[in-house]
């Protein structure tokens, strides 16, 4: 199984980082987990065309995690010779989001149907949506997945995914604080991908901003680097993969971020720029 951090950014715009998105490749499947701003461009940089993505897993409905979903859907539809709908698996509410997105894209679809006979013959732009919750399971080709509860309150629901292929396990959490559901999802995983923030840097930034309370509010519903490392150690994870860096990680700060994790977790800690990857 190969994990590629397509986007390691966050809601804070960063010219060096796309929004939250992770690519998992296993058993001939290309699976995107979340689809933040710029994810499609990073997908191409990873050598994967939109039509090669079979499924997008969505952890929760915060805008920074789904901004590029419409681009993924449209690009697949326009570029593929055969209309194969994207499969989107996410928490309750994702169907309404996709329906609204398709309504937004209706004029574009009509323009393209009017201009391209073969595209019109392929049929309408559609998406296969599956709403899931903790305890549910699914398959993507030879990859099996289970759904686990995470804690991003007041965001409800929020979920994570445990993907397995040929004895290897990758656990992927979106935004969450440590909780039993994440521990269960990560148990003995070969890799655990966690979005993180730096409490110390966020607090300092909040103190410097006139509307700093808004920044300070995010401290209570994200995992810190240290907490992610503690979860990894507690769950017996082999590799800890960090992403969604808040505030944006500046070049040269990697060792500082990694040191906060290695103080609590003895295994490999993977972090870095977009397109950083690991195979397990």
Regions found by a protein language model. Name each.
Residues 169-171, 177-274:
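Cap/insert and terminal regions of metallo-dependent hydrolase folds
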Residues 1-171, 177-180, 184, 256-279:
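Binuclear metal-dependent hydrolase catalytic cores
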